[in-house]
Amino acid sequence: DGSITMQNPYWANYRNLRENRKDRYMLNAALSYDILDWLNVSGRIRIDNSHNTYTEKMYASSNVQLTEQSANGLYGVTKTMDRQVYGDALLNINKTFGDDWSLQANIGASFSDMKNDALKIRGPIADGTSGEKQGLANVFNIQNLSNSTKTVRKQEGWREQTQSIFASAEVGYKGTYYLTLTGRNDWPSQLAGPHSNAKSFFYPSVGLSVVLSQLIPNMPENLSYIKLRGSFASVGVAFERYIANPLYSWNESGLSWNTQ
């Protein structure tokens, strides 16, 4: 088939270069303080940052199907930054009332912030065929790229943040009967736009449980614990970004902004 071309494997290995480098660092910290023997506060924070650089270098004399038809080669570089930050603070309660009643509860708040930024340029090295000044073969620099529509220049990114408050409580009676209640309210950034009917959502749960092994006398030795539990819960999740707050999009082929 005359439409199929092949390259020397040695050339493909040493003159068609693709390199990916990623630098990443993470930080975790937590603090806890006992106010009373049944009451304490705690806080946590987690940071995860990464920087990624992806480069392409196609040398002159490479298959022009790989260089956007340029005889002088192709160059591309994409830089991406990702950042994730999470933090929370909690007030924790663990208390008994007499011999029969117990309470385990917590009240807290949290936030989650995620951000992505990307900058990309990729295109053929100018070879003079489009009426522009010829570039320097095998000089991998963005100023050396063609100004034609074959060169892609793109900057994009997104950011999402969710702020939350939550609480849970479990009341126990005689170590046998338990009532569990939880509730959480989220304010996600995806709902912050003008097309959203609500800025937050609440999702609760309720549960009842009985430790049957506390009620059954003469339990078999090989069966030491039986618990019956029933619960109801609702779950909330935000929809995709930009639905409530649409943005303009870039038309690469027409080199113009698409209006919403």
Question: Residue ranges of each PLM-predicted region?
Answer:
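Short amphipathic helix-turn modules centered on a small-residue break
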Residues: 60-62
